[in-house]
From Swiss-Prot:
InterPro entries: A-amylase/branching_C (IPR006048), Branching_enzy (IPR037439), Glyco_hydro_13_cat_dom (IPR006047), Glyco_hydro_13_N (IPR004193), Glyco_hydro_b (IPR013780), Glycoside_hydrolase_SF (IPR017853), Ig-like_fold (IPR013783), Ig_E-set (IPR014756). Its EC number is 2.4.1.18. It catalyses: Transfers a segment of a (1->4)-alpha-D-glucan chain to a primary hydroxy group in a similar glucan chain. It is found in: Cytoplasm. Keywords: Cytoplasm, Glycogen biosynthesis, Glycosyltransferase, Transferase. Pathway: Glycan biosynthesis; glycogen biosynthesis. SMART domains: Aamy. Belongs to the glycosyl hydrolase 13 family. GlgB subfamily. It is an enzyme of class 2 (transferase). One of its GO terms (biological process) is glycogen biosynthetic process. GO terms for cellular component: cytoplasm. This is 1,4-alpha-glucan-branching enzyme.
């Protein structure tokens, strides 16, 4: 460890190959530590914590009502403006009557407005507001307050007169929702996350936008029944364009009004907590919508207030048609860190899945030739790696904040395809602080196999290598498919395997066809081996647990604004005559087995067998034996499987059970597999099992 800076010795001890890059790692950590020091000492003559900094920001910026005095304070940062005025329904949209009188040296305007003539708040609850800025040349621009907590689509009449831009509303309910349940306390040393990825708007079988209340009533019970202990909510931050899937955020502190009110979202999260389910927010800090009239773009009349300037070449994403934040700006740090604290405190979110981390980490955004990462450390840690040091420092601060606010159970997940080293190691040892990264190579592997290879040509070694290929001590969220694979232009695993047969042959009243038989069998095997071998956490996109047919396509001009494919057909599971119920039952059994035997939050599995001819894979993890026969036709009698611990083993999960859509080829009752004291495949003992084609077994040793 000679020559390695003290502040990154921890990560180098975990990965000695990082030693030559110690100085670079140290400098990157130093920038984040310096920013934190500057933030905590920004108050003259005093000190405040990072948490206090973030909380003070969301509690002071924007519109805030004082219940005792009935006054409203409005604070906004707009350094390019010379004057600022609050307008809205409350003053007949008079652009001169309510000026924010004070502008400080940093460009922050503040106005305090007393009660109205009736003694109540000057601005009625849920009424429309805007801010008007006067610029140096005397021109005026109209904007939605940057910290607004509710924004809604205009009525048809308003849209005809003023355009389709969203409208800001002053949210100040007389009886705000009161949380009833504490956050679930999942011991991270024991429990692992089984995440159900969901989008409230599509969570209805009907071709329309679903609501928070419907999700609470109809979907949460399904998630609990399946055995997932966390939900990842997508498209919550307000976005004017529904078809953006929530990734073109316009109003960062407003939750999507399409689904209902802020209080109804609070009830959803509180209800989930009462079920013992954590709730994660899919947070979008990687970019922002280009919208001007209802977004952050050109907010104070400049293109460089929250974002890098267009002229710098860093202000726009090359593919996403969106604006890119200037993470080196103190005020941008305030805005984004406060955004995280706001969702933790006000809505009781338990953590975040950070969207677009690869785009944030590199000046090239993972696009083009430089986005084809080979794993060479020079791609990440050389002077020419293209890493955006300011974005990396912001992500470190964000992780500091979240884990300071939620020290026991806060969860952070990075959507990173690049494999950046130390991303998911603790800040205390020199890492970036994320708890998990998404294992984004796994769904790509499964789709590629299904598209390009015959079943008999699948390489067991390639499957295993891809599933276990992750950085030491850096945890990943494994998944076979997510929302990305469901989007139009791609297909879900079930649709790749069964295609048109899902429309005609899923009824139990018809004889099982070879296409559906294969699809159901492989769907179970793919998901179980991904779950058990691919990571330390698991994610499923809603509907995929039962093999949801078709693709996901939001209403847009190309499909005639249709909602036909922007929904989840949960009714298919409830129909006892359809085979979707079998896949649902298997997914439930898989989650229950993990919940009881807890293989996810344990060291990586020991893989003892990858047989290319037999198409059999076997491994042990946390005392369990997992056996997969991917062969399309060949079943094996008395197949030898190496196990380390001697004893008697029993089946705890069998994909061939009838209730899972299998053929019941294994007699489970009173089945016990006794070990033979002879070495096999590098293990001290072996058992012999009957292994039908396209079947998976999980065995546990009897106590």
């Amino acid at each position: 460890m000679a020559g390695v800076p003290d502040n990154v010795k921890g990560v180098v001890e975990l990965d000695p190959w990082l030693a030559p890059y110690g100085d670079i790692l140290s400098a990157r950590r130093f920038l984040a530590d310096k920013w934190r020091h500057d933030i905590e000492h920004a108050v003259p003559g005093g000190r405040r914590s990072l948490v206090e900094f973030a909380r003070d920001a969301y509690k002071s910026y924007g519109l805030h009502a004082d219940a005792q005095s009935k006054s409203i304070t409005y604070r906004e940062w707009a350094p390019n403006a010379t004057r600022a005025f609050l307008v809205g329904d409350f003053n007949g949209w008079d652009e001169t009557s309510h000026e924010l009188q004070n502008k400080d040296e940093f460009g922050v305007f503040t106005g305090v407005f007393g009660p109205g003539a009736d003694g109540d708040f000057m601005i009625p609850h849920d009424s429309r507001v805007k801010v008007v800025f006067e610029l140096a040349d005397g021109s005026r621009i109209h904007r939605l307050p940057a910290w607004i907590k509710r924004a809604t689509q205009p009525s048809k009449e308003t849209a005809k007169e003023w355009g389709p831009s969203y409208e800001a509303r002053f949210w100040n309910p007389a009886s705000p929702y009161k949380f009833k349940h504490e956050r679930p306390r999942l011991d991270p040393n024991v429990e692992s996350l089984r995440i159900y990825e969901a989008h409230v708007g599509i969570s209805t079988p009907e071709p329309r936008v679903g609501s928070y209340s419907e999700f609470t009533k109809d979907v949460l019970p399904r998630i609990r029944d399946l055995g997932y202990n966390a939900i990842q909510l997508m498209a919550i931050m307000e976005h004017a364009y529904y078809a953006s899937f929530g990734y073109q955020v316009t109003n960062f502190f407003a939750v999507s009004s399409r689904y209902g009110t802020p209080e109804e979202l609070k009830e959803l999260i509180d209800t989930a907590h009462g079920m013992g389910i954590q709730v994660l927010l899919d947070v979008v800090h990687s970019h922002a919508s280009k919208n001007v009239s209802d977004g952050l773009n050109m907010f104070d009349g400049t293109d460089y207030q929250y974002f890098h300037s267009i002229s710098s070449g860093r202000g726009e994403h090359p593919l996403w048609d969106s604006r890119l934040f200037n993470y080196g700006s103190f005020e941008v740090q305030r805005f984004l860190l406060a955004n995280l604290a706001f969702y933790i405190d006000v809505y009781q979110f338990d953590g975040f899945r950070f969207d677009g981390v690869t785009s944030m980490l590199y000046h090239h955004h993972g696009v083009g030739e430089r986005g084809a990462f080979s794993g060479d450390y020079n791609e990440y840690l050389s002077d020419h790696s293209g890493v955006d040091h300011e974005a990396l420092a912001y992500l470190m601060l964000a992780n500091d904040l979240i884990h300071d606010m939620l020290p026991a159970n806060g969860v952070t997940v990075a959507e990173d395809v690049s494999g950046y080293p130390t991303l998911c190691l603790p800040r205390s040892v020199g890492g970036c602080g994320f708890d998990y990264r998404l294992a984004m190579a796994l769904p790509d592997m499964w789709i590629k196999l299904l598209k390009e290879s015959k079943d008999e040509d699948w390489s067991m070694g390639h499957i295993v290598y891809t599933l276990v290929n992750r950085r030491y001590k850096e945890k990943v969220v494994a998944y076979a498919e997510s929302h990305d694979q469901a989007l139009v232009g791609d297909k879900t695993l079930a649709f790749w395997m069964m295609d048109a047969a899902m429309y005609t042959d899923m009824t139990v009243l018809k004889e099982l066809t070879p296409v559906v038989d294969r699809g159901i069998a492989l769907h179970k095997l793919i998901r179980l081996i991904t779950h058990s071998l691919g990571g330390e956490s698991y994610l499923n996109f809603e509907g995929n647990e039962f093999g949801h047919p078709e693709w996901l396509d939001f209403p847009n001009a190309n499909n005639g604004d249709s909602y036909q494919y922007a929904r989840r057909q949960f009714n298919l599971v409830d129909d006892g005559l359809l085979r979707y119920k079998h896949l649902y039952a298997f997914d439930k059994a898989m989650q229950e087995a993990e919940g009881k035997h807890k293989w996810l939050n344990t060291p990586q599995a020991y893989v003892s067998l990858k047989h290319e001819t037999d198409k059999v894979i076997s491994f042990e993890r946390n005392g369990l034996v997992f056996i997969f026969n991917f062969h399309p036709t060949q079943s094996f009698t008395d197949y030898r499987i190496g196990v380390d611990e001697a004893g008697a083993y029993r089946i705890i999960l069998n994909s061939d059970r009838e209730e899972f859509g299998g053929h019941r080829r294994i007699e489970e009752e009173n089945s016990v597999f006794h070990t033979t004291d002879l070495e096999w495949n590098g293990r001290r003992n072996f058992i012999q099992v009957y292994l039908p084609s396209r079947t998976a077994l999980v065995l546990a040793r009897n106590p």
